[in-house]
Amino acid sequence: ATSGKVIRCRAAVAWAVGKPLSVEEVEVAPPKAGEVRIKIVATGICRTDDHVVKGCIANVEFPVIPGHEGAGIVESIGEGVTSVKPGDKVIPLCIPNCGECTFCLNPEASYCVKSHFSEPQNLMPDKTSRFTCKGKQIHHFMWVSTFAEYTVAPETAVAKIDSAAPLDKVCLLGCGFSTGYGAAINTAKVKPGSTCAVFGLGGVGLSVVMGCKVAGASRIIAIDINKDKFAKAKELGATDCINPQDFNKPIQEVVTEMTGHEVDYSFEVIGRADTMIAALASCNMNTGVFVMVGVAPSDAVISVDPLLLLTGRTHKGTLVGGSKGRNFIPRLVSSYLEKKFNSDLLITHTLPFAKVNEGFALLHAGKSIRTVLLF
């Protein structure tokens, strides 16, 4: 009944940098050719959404509807769309897969040339918006904008998932869980029997812990200044939990003493220059791999002692799991349904969408791992 028509619905709009999100009635236009309109059922609150509101993400334009960790049901499709149909369960992808660019055609690559990092995704590919509010054009965020009851995304940024998937649980697989789990499985390629160190135990850091465990790591050292996170980290597979504030020496020295020769893989899941360097220094020379997972502020700079790299360490970065989302996310959902991992353990709070700012307050206070908003 709604196909081809403008839909009026609720969305959380960031009108300006630093202002709390405002739940507004917005108009969502029908999808154009190659686009999909999705009824969002559930969306997680990710630290990156907080970075958007605070103005820390480069190239985002205001006013904007944030949110990029959602799951929903296809409401209608534009001309030429073949991979999904109305009624399909889907997860929108904050990094698309056009399937045609040099990166999409490279089996080793995972980030499409059409991602936000090479050309901003504040408007749809035709450079117009599908959102309006109070007569004003509202920008998209990474083509997904899941803080809206209905959103429009290009077909290339939509992954069809198993119809048995519970959307209020698998929404995390759109960003937070897949980012951490994939950093261990796809980017680092953690080997059985190896040692790992994970800096930062938020939702993504704990997902790294889960990925390291599934990959067969024999020792997983979890590091955070909030001891309240240690019980959950151990439940998910960490063998050791340490707080840098308990030591009067650099944390990389503590890790070296614990292991005797540094770790095989280290992950920084915070987004701070100092902890990135500490994590790099915590992995061993010759074969140590450091993976940068946390998103640093857009003006951050890291200064590295060249000797750390000259002696053989590898410094890698990863986004949303280091794999092509249209393939990886459906596979992850299948693994979830097969109970290969339990990402539900990351969900500490479930709130109605109207309480979106309460969800951000829980994040700021360090009281939540993941809050899921339900429409």
From Swiss-Prot:
The residues listed in the UniProt record as binding Zn(2+) 2, with positions renumbered to this chain, are 98, 101, 104, 112
Pfam families given in the database record: ADH_N, ADH_zinc_N
The Swiss-Prot or TrEMBL record annotates one GO molecular function as: all-trans-retinol dehydrogenase (NAD+) activity
Q: Which residues carry this modification: N-acetylalanine?
A: 1
Query: Quick one: which residues bind Zn(2+) 1?
Result: 46, 68, 175
GO biological process assignments: retinoic acid metabolic process; retinol metabolic process
Its Enzyme Commission number(s) read 1.1.1.1
Annotated Gene Ontology cellular component terms: cytosol
Annotated NAD(+) binding lies at 200-205, 224, 229, 293-295, 370
Q: Which InterPro entries match?
A: ADH-like_C, ADH-like_N, ADH_Zn_CS, GroES-like_sf, NAD(P)-bd_dom_sf
What class does this enzyme belong to in the EC scheme? oxidoreductase
What's the record's note on cofactor binding?
Answer: Binds 2 Zn(2+) ions per subunit.
Principal subcellular localisation of the protein: cytoplasm
Q: Reaction catalysed?
A: a primary alcohol + NAD(+) = an aldehyde + NADH + H(+); a secondary alcohol + NAD(+) = a ketone + NADH + H(+)
Q: Which UniProt keywords apply?
A: Acetylation, Cytoplasm, Metal-binding, NAD, Oxidoreductase, Zinc
The UniProt subunit note reads as follows: Homodimer.
Q: Which family does it belong to?
A: Belongs to the zinc-containing alcohol dehydrogenase family. Class-I subfamily.
What is this protein identified as?
Answer: Alcohol dehydrogenase 1
Instruction: Show the taxonomic lineage.
Output: Eukaryota, Metazoa, Chordata, Craniata, Vertebrata
Q: Which gene encodes it?
A: ADH1
